[in-house]
Amino acid sequence: ADLKGLDLSGLNLDKANLISAILTGANLKGISLVGANLFSVKAMRADFSGANLSGANLLKANLTRTKLQESNFNDADMTGINLSDADMRKTDLTRAKLVEANLPGVDLTGADLSEAKLTGRYQREGYFSRGANLKKGVLVGAKMQGADASGTDMVETDCTDVDFTNANLSEANFKHARLKSTCFVNTKLGDADFRGANVIDCDFSGAELIEAKFQGVDLSSVKNISAEELQSSQIDSETKIPDYIEVNWTSEDTYE
């Protein structure tokens, strides 16, 4: 169906079949699409502000540069979706499936991604693909408690005030990310890469840091990082350690 540029605001299209529909530039403000099938839909630059898409199927949909503020994607399947440069401020993505999602430049300020899944997946060829791409995104104040975001790409992403409590971020890439007052309480961060990241006032209480890469990172202001976990991570003589942990360097890359 070609619905390009149409005004569909406020309509109830629950459980509608819109497979491969063209919604480019359409006005879908406040629309209800609960449980709808939007597989492979093209909705670039459309306005979904305040829309309800809970439980919808958005596999491989293209929502580049869409407006999605305060919309509801509870339990939606968004595997392989393209949300590049989308405005998703205050969006509810609780338990949403964002496997292999492409979200570079997305604005998720104040969004709720509790228990969302942002991982890669096993391909037929037998290899595991990378997690969601959130490169250069804005996640200020987002809730990501219990989210599975292993392997997620957060290079240069702004994660100020994000709550990652109990999340799985193993192998996540935080290179050059902004991590100010970010909460990593009980977070799995094994093999995560923090090199070049701006890490200020973050809480690492109970975080798992095996092989996490902190070479050259300033950790002087972080809270509750345990000496034991830090020892299991990768640091070097350029890493700035908090005052409450004592490290004696015996050579450039060994310490006691």
Protein language model regions, located:
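Tandem repeat scaffolds
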Residues: 1-256
